[in-house]
Every structure is written in structure tokens, then in C-alpha cells.
Amino acid sequence: MSRGSIEIPLRDTDEVIELDFDQLPEGDEVISILKQEHTQLHIWIALALEYYKQGKTEEFVKLLEAARIDGNLDYRDHEKDQMTCLDTLAAYYVQQARKEKNKDNKKDLITQATLLYTMADKIIMYDQNHLLGRACFCLLEGDKMDQADAQFHFVLNQSPNNIPALLGKACISFNKKDYRGALAYYKKALRTNPGCPAEVRLGMGHCFVKLNKLEKARLAFSRALELNSKCVGALVGLAVLELNNKEADSIKNGVQLLSRAYTIDPSNPMVLNHLANHFFFKKDYSKVQHLALHAFHNTEVEAMQAESCYQLARSFHVQEDYDQAFQYYYQATQFASSSFVLPFFGLGQMYIYRGDKENASQCFEKVLKAYPNNYETMKILGSLYAASEDQEKRDIAKGHLKKVTEQYPDDVEAWIELAQILEQTDIQGALSAYGTATRILQEKVQADVPPEILNNVGALHFRLGNLGEAKKYFLASLDRAKAEAEHDEHYYNAISVTTSYNLARLYEAMCEFHEAEKLYKNILREHPNYVDCYLRLGAMARDKGNFYEASDWFKEALQINQDHPDAWSLIGNLHLAKQEWGPGQKKFERILKQPATQSDTYSMLALGNVWLQTLHQPTRDREKEKRHQDRALAIYKQVLRNDAKNLYAANGIGAVLAHKGYFREARDVFAQVREATADISDVWLNLAHIYVEQKQYISAVQMYENCLRKFYKHQNTEVVLYLARALFKCGKLQECKQTLLKARHVAPSDTVLMFNVALVLQRLATSVLKDEKSNLKEVLNAVKELELAHRYFSYLSKVGDKMRFDLALAASEARQCSDLLSQAQYHVARARKQDEEERELRAKQEQEKELLRQKLLKEQEEKRLREKEEQKKLLEQRAQYVEKTKNILMFTGETEATKEKKRGGGGGRRSKKGGEFDEFVNDDTDDDLPVSKKKKRRKGSGSEQEGEEEEGGERKKKRRRRPPKGEEGSEEEETENGPKPKKRRPPRAEKKKAPKPERLPPSMKGKIKSKAIISSSDDSSDEDKLKIADEGHPRNSNSDSDDDERPNRRASSESDSDDNQNKSGSEAGSPRRSGRQESDEDSDSDQPSRKRRRSGSEQSDNESVQSGRSPSGASENENDSRPASPSAESDHESEQGSDNEGSGQGSGNESEPEGSNNEASDRGSEHGSDDSD
């Protein structure tokens, strides 16, 4: 077999037929030869491929179709040839389907390819070439990309460098937006076979573009062009890169590249669309339409068709052929992918032109979804939603426009749109937005503020109650409109009329009715059909009480527009105000009969209110009442069906429920309405009525009062009457009376108020007269009020308002008042008698009180005089004591002189048991103590070193005699245990020199030793007095103890003398230098005397530890005081008195003592004298 021919073996011979490839016969002839010779299948396939290479596709298909049936399979490995035949024919059908533009033909081709591949699967399923072909077929179908991926993957597992599989995987990765993965597959294919066709470089270039590596993409496209100068894809890629540079030279280069591509392939849709886009910016719209239409018809790819339709649509759009533009925009949206939203933007504009804002909004929403922060889209959507009646959409618009103003703060249109949205919900925010727009106009744009904006700002200030600001802006708007009228007189005159009407409304609010009326009439002269002016003039007349004039103005409005609902509503309200329910009902029914206003909410509510009002009139026809309730309820329900948020209808339903007796349900309805808004006074009143019906009078009163404060400024007599009724029902008649009298001040001629005042006066008077505890003044006042009530009822029974209450009831109440007045004299007499009895009783009580007061004054005076006398006696005793002290000092001086003489003569004359010193012992014997003890005593606390001092002299201790047996326990104690130490002043320790101890007599030495041991306790006797006084009872421990206990006490005092000495040094202070010694008439020796002193010392030590204070009246700075000698028994009482006086008063030279100690010593002077003595 030669290279340019093929041999066909003849059946049953060794001969062959040689067919030269350059001279292949017709396909049918070849088929007949092959059939006749029963040729093997692989020869059929080889001949078919040669026909395909020569472009004879029909013969190629015929041969393969015949080979499927007539090919000889009687040889080894024929299955592979059989599979190759089926796959080759299927691959051809797939290729034809990719090129086919007719959808039906394309579908047929795909069906045939599917059938062939299915047959091949049954022969050898996992052949690489079969899997590759099938995978490419799946790629063509588009929705079987995962199957194709799996088959390419299978092939690569068997043959990692299979280039078709690598390219297939690259294609799938690119479509899945895995551009890096796609690029890796392309690179691997290129490394495997560097001689790959240019399309591999083209694929790499697209991957580089998606990865934003534009320079590498440019290199890849350039290399593809080098490999294949007619590669249209590479030319288009380079052209797009050049056009995106947005420079004149680059754009020129890009267009030249597109022109080359167009020359190579005039039917390439990508080239055609890019050229159409170029000519659109060149404003050559005819070429745009020609190229785009040509591109549309030369592609079956929907994305390319969408691009073509978009180019066509916008060329028609810019030429204002909106119907054609709409058609192509719509068609582009049908073909476009989700990421291509430009056709939706154009289609939305077309919907706006057609007035279909709903569809327009949907289109722009799709654009905004793809580009969330697109400025133009947000602005258009904000403007569309701003005009919507749906509050949710208005809120969306507000959000969009706020974003727009944040991105572009100088966009005046966006600020104005935002202000218009905020007008309904946020007046202050709207004013701020208008202010920003005004500032931008004046500063950035250098333009005058339009009169429309000034008028809107004035209207906003009017709504806020800033009437002065509103007037300023209205006048400025009028001036601006007059200035602008030169350019467009008709438009700006219309603005002037609107602003003038707003200014007239402002004058109404400012109570300048004359100015308002003048402006309304001026407008009507120029524009007689301005209905609102007639209505406002009528409303002003109605507010003045001129109902007939108001009716005339409303009828004037009806002459202009016979079906004007506002005019009929105002006339109907006039009838209702005059309680003409029938005519008023007809007016509102007329409004509802008109087709345009058949579901007018206001009229339906008014009708419901008319039926509800009939329920307030007393009637005995229960059926009629129930019928009216059902009608009112049905109307209110209808209103709620039309407008689910209508609060007035809900309030009406609550009122009907209350009339039916469902008070709890009615209260729930009213409560929900009040939660929704607190600006409807009727809801507050209805809630209060419900509280009254439920007997919750306190809550009702609070609700009525809150309603008066919030809505009526305390001047609405109707609400005041409701309040009075609640007070009357809860029994607060006085508050009820005051409330009604306030209402009478507002409406003095109101007969219902007069009736209620009379009724309350009657009830108050009745309660006072029946109360037997009422005094004469209250009874007389009640009779007076009862007479007034009688006059009121008598008057009302003759000239009362029959429509508001029953005159017979007034006459009945008048008779009842008359009956009460006839019984009043009895109550007056009773009260008068009771009053006289009370007066007598009060007089008697006053007299007794006066006597008691005088008695108390007398007792106080006597007490004062008695205290004065006692004080005087104390002063006299003090004087006596001072005198005696002086005498003692003189006597002490003589005694010291005698002592000095005796010392000079020798000490042997003293006797052990008696002598001079047994009769008188001088306690001022610190001079005889050892020096060491004296120093030790100086270390004591300052309170114990203090001495008491008399006004200028030194105090000597007095000798004390043994008291008689008949005295108190303290004196008995002195008899047994020795004298109780008396308070003494400490000596001046620093100025005295210690005398030599050997000069003392032997008897004195023993006493001094004993005295030194107990010296600290002797001075604590005064502290005992303070303790007694503080405790409030006399302390007499010695007198309380029995005779049997005394020896025990003595023994303990002797054994513990050392401890007592330590205690007196540590707890009560350092030991004193002075001591007291007294001779005992019953004892001949010193020893019993010592024991007695120790026992007393121990007791006083313990007491001084408890007290812990320095003696009262002691001076810290007096060092000149000296210890005094004991006085005789005859001086006992004077000393006691002077001691008390001195401790209570203190001398003039002493420092002021603590007040508590002085008071204690004064109080304890009488009780403590026995102990201290």
C-alpha cells in the first residue's frame, strides 16, 4: 500500500483494488465496492477520514453510516475499530451542532451524537479517545460540566500528559472561575508540547486578564498572533487592552486591531459588538445598529446576543426612539447573565418614561444588587420610592438618599429629595436637608434659592409652630417668585398663588383673621376656582359661630365642584354640630355614593359616629338600640378593612363594645389605641368612662384630669362635667362642688351645670343635716346651700332645656329640697343647743386650765425662793468655813513652833502610848519621810499631785473626836476601824526639804510608816463622793457590813497592804506625801490605830481605783498649798458644809474644774458627808 493510496482486498482472491487519495471516486461507488468485497471495518474508517480531510463531509458521513451496518467485523480487535467508527461519526455531529444556529437542527445533531456515544459505551467504555470525545460533547451541552470534568480526570490519571485532557480541564477551570488552575493546565500542556496551536496561548491570555496581569496577557495574545496571524481571539484581546487604556493612541490602535479582526472574520460576534460599542461613542448610530444586528444573527451564545441587543437598545435610546429602545432593552435582559445588568438599567429608565414605577424599581433593584454602592442607581431608587405611599419603601428611599449624600455631599438634587422624604416623619431633619441644599446652591453653584424650596421651608416652620420664621420664608418665596416670573410667568405665578395661600393659613394661626381673609379673597379674584380658599373662609366663619355664613361659603365651593368631598364633609359637620343628625347623615352618604369617594374613610367614620351618637339618647326600644349598635360596628369594621391602621375606627369599635356592656374588651381596645398614639383626646375620655363604669373612680378622676391638662387647658365644660360625675360617684362631694363651680365660671348659662350644682348642694346639705356631729356653723351653711339648690331646681323646672334633662326631675328635686328645708329648723335647734353645750364645756375647761396654770406658777415661784434660800445658807456656811480655816492656820503655826522647841530639847520625853502626839497628830509630816520615798511619790500622775487650795490660805487638817454611839453607820465604822480618811490637798513637793528622820519620836515613826503605806488611799475619799453622786445613791460599804465581817476585812487589809500600795501607785496615781492619824480613846497602843488606818486605806484604795479621777476642785498649778491638820468633832458639820461648798463652787484662785465632777460633788454632798468624815 502506497502512501497516497489505499488497497481494498477482493473477496476470495489475493488481488486488491488500489484507490489513489488524489482520485477518490464518488462516495456511493466506494460504498458499493466495500460492500461487495465485504471489506473490513478499519478500511471503511480510513477511507472516511480521507474524504473528511479533503472536505468531502457528505461522503465522510455516508461511509461511516454504512460502515456501522455493513463493515466486516470478522477479524481480531474489531471492537476497537467499531468504537472508533461510532466515536468519529459522533464527534462530527458534535462539531456540526456547535456551528449550527438553528435550534431544532442543533437539537437533532446532539441527539444523534448522544445515541452514537451510548452505543460506543457498550463496546469499550474506558478507551481514552472515547472518553475524550464524550467529555468534549458534555462541555458542549453546558449543563454536564461535572461529567466532563470526571472523564478528563480519568484520562489524566491514566495518561498525565494527555494534551486534549489538559486543555479540557483548563476550559472547565476557566468556566468555574478558577483562573489560576486553568492557567496551570495550559502551562502544562505547553510544556508537554511546545508546538501547541495558538489557541493555547489565547487561553493563557484570557487567564492573565482575569488575574489582572495585563502585561502578561498582552504578551500571550501577541505570541498567539505570531503563531497564527489570523487568530481573531488574540486580535480582539489586544484591542480590548488597548481600548481600556483610554488614551487617544491606544483607542486608535484598538480600533485598528478590531478592523483587522473584522477583515479576517466579518461574522465574528465579538468583533462586531466591540466595533458597535466604538461607533456608539463616535455617535455613528446607524453603524452601531448594523454591526450589532449582524452580531446578534451570527451567534447562538446568549451572552453575545445580550450584548448585541444592548448596543441596539442604547442607540435607539439616545435617538429618543423609546419604543424600539424598550424592545431591545427587554430582549437583552432575557439573554443577559446575572452579572450583565446594564440592560436592566436602561430598561428601568424606559419604565420610568412609561410611568411604570413598580417595574422600574424592580429593574434598578437588580442593578443595585450587583453594584450595591452605585451612586446613580441609589439616587434613582430613592427618588422612585420617595413618591411611594408605602412607608417601608419611603424608609428604603431615605436610606438610599442618605448614602448618596454621604458619597456626594454636594449633590443638591439628592438633598432636596431627602428633605421631601423627611417632611412626613422628621420635620427637623427635613429643615436641615433643605438648609444644606440652600447652602450648596448659594456657595457652590452660585445660584439663587428657588421659591419652591423657600415655600417648603416656610411650611415646615409653620408645622413646627415657628410662625415668625415661617412668615419670613413665605415672604421671601413670594419675592423670589416675582423676580423669576420674567423667565416663566405662568409657572412662577402658580407658585405665588400656593405661597399666598400658605401665608393666609399662617395669618389664621396668628389670629390675624382680617389679613387671612384679605389674602383668600385676593386669590379668589385672580383664581375663582381655588376651592380651598372658599373652604377656609367658611371654616373661619364657622369658628366665629356664624354657621349660616360658613354654609354659604361651603356652597360656593360646591358650585365650582359639585362633588367636592371636603365641602360636603364640612356641611355635614355643621349639621352634626347643631345635633341635626338626619341632614348630616345624608351629606356623608352622598359622598359615599360617588364612585371616586365610595370608600372615603372620613365619611364612613362620620356615619359610624352618627349611629353611635343615637345610642346616647335615652330610648326604651331595645331592638332599635341594638340595630344602631350593629350598624355602627359594621361601618367601623369596614373602615378597618380598608385601612388597618385607622385608630379612629378602632376607637369607635371600643365605644360600641362599651355600649353593649363589654367593658373589659372595650378597655383593651382603648388601651391599644392609646399605645399607638397619645394625641387623640377621645381615647382618654373613653378610657375614663370605662373606669367609671367599672367603679374605678380614682383612676377615672386621674384620667379626666390628665385629659383636661393635655388637651383642653381646663376650659372644656363637657370634660369638667365628666370629672364632676366621677367625683360624685366616688363620694367626694366637696371636690365635685368645686369642680362644677369652676365650670360655671366658664359657662354660667349652662342649665345642665346648674342642675348638677344644685344636686351636689342638696346632697351635701342632706349629709350635713343628718350628721348629728355637725356644728352650728355647718348646719346654717347647709341650710343656706339647700335654699340655693331649691331656687335652682325651681328655676330649672320652668325654663330648663328639655333636650338635655327631664324638667319633671328638676321639679321633683325642688320638692325634695322644700321638704328638707321644712325639717331644717329642727336640725338648726339641735345644732344650736349642741353648740351652747360645747361652749359651756370649753369655758369650764379653760377655767380649770387657768387654775392649773396659776398653781404651777405658784409652785415654781416657791421652788425658786427655796433654792435661793438654800444658796444663801451655803454662802454663809462657806464664809464660816473660811473663817475657821484661818483660825486653824494660826493654830498650826503655833503648833509648829512648839514642835521645833521640843525637837531642840530631845525626843526622849515622848511616851509610847500617850502624850501630846496621841491627842493631836499632824498629817503634815512628809518632812519626816525618807528622801527616796519622796522622790518616788513625785513620779505620780499630775492629778494626784494636785492640791486643793482655799482662797488665800493653807488648809490644816482637823482633829476628829470619836462620835457617839447613836450616830449612823459611817460613824460606827469610824469607831471600830478608825476614822475614814477625808479629802486633803497634796503638799507642795518641790519647795519642802525632807527633814532628818532621826528627829522624829519613836511613836510617830510607826505612824508615819503606816501612813506612808496607805497615804494614796486617804485622798481618794473625795473620789468616793464623786462616784456616789454619779451613781445616784449613797455609798456606805462600812455601815452595810456586819460586825462579824469586820475582822476579816482588817485581816485582808493587813495582808494586802503591799498590794494596795502598788495599786494606789499604778491605778489611782502616785502616793501622796501626806497622811492622817488620829488617836483612839479606847486603845493605848499604836497598833490598833494602824490596823484601822490600813483597813480604811484598803477600802479607799479600791474606791479610788473604781473612780479613777482626781478630786474635784484640785488645782494643777497651785504649789503653795499645805496639808491641813484634822479638825475636832465640833467642827465636823462646818467642815462638811465648807467641803461641799468648796467642791461645788471652787475658790477664785483655782482652775475651773470639770463640770461633771462639780455637779457630782454638789449632788453627793449630803449623802457622802458621813463617808468622807
Swiss-Prot record:
Keyword set for this entry? Answer: Nucleus, Phosphoprotein, Repeat, TPR repeat, Transcription, Transcription regulation, Wnt signaling pathway
| Single GO biological process annotation from the record | Wnt signaling pathway
Q: Where is the composition biased (Low complexity)?
A: 1137-1159
Name the residue ranges with Basic and acidic residues bias: 1023-1034, 1160-1173
Which positions carry Phosphoserine? S932, S941, S943, S970, S1020, S1021, S1037, S1039, S1041, S1079, S1083, S1085, S1095, S1100
Task: Provide the protein's localization.
Answer: Nucleus speckle
Q: In which tissues is it expressed?
A: Widely expressed.
Q: Which InterPro entries match?
A: Ctr9, TPR-like_helical_dom_sf, TPR_rpt
- Where is composition skewed (Acidic residues) in this entry? 917-929
GO CC terms in record: Cdc73/Paf1 complex; euchromatin; nuclear speck; nucleus
Q: Return the TPR repeat spans.
A: 41-75, 129-162, 163-196, 198-231, 235-268, 306-339, 341-374, 412-444, 451-484, 497-530, 531-564, 566-598, 613-646, 647-680, 681-714, 717-750
- Main localization (coarse): nucleus
Compositionally biased spans, kind Basic residues: 900-912, 980-994
Outline the subunit composition. Answer: Component of the PAF1 complex, which consists of CDC73, PAF1, LEO1, CTR9, RTF1 and SKIC8. The PAF1 complex interacts with PHF5A. Interacts with KMT2A/MLL1. Interacts with STAT3. Interacts with SETD5. Interacts with ERCC6.
Q: What is this protein called?
A: RNA polymerase-associated protein CTR9 homolog
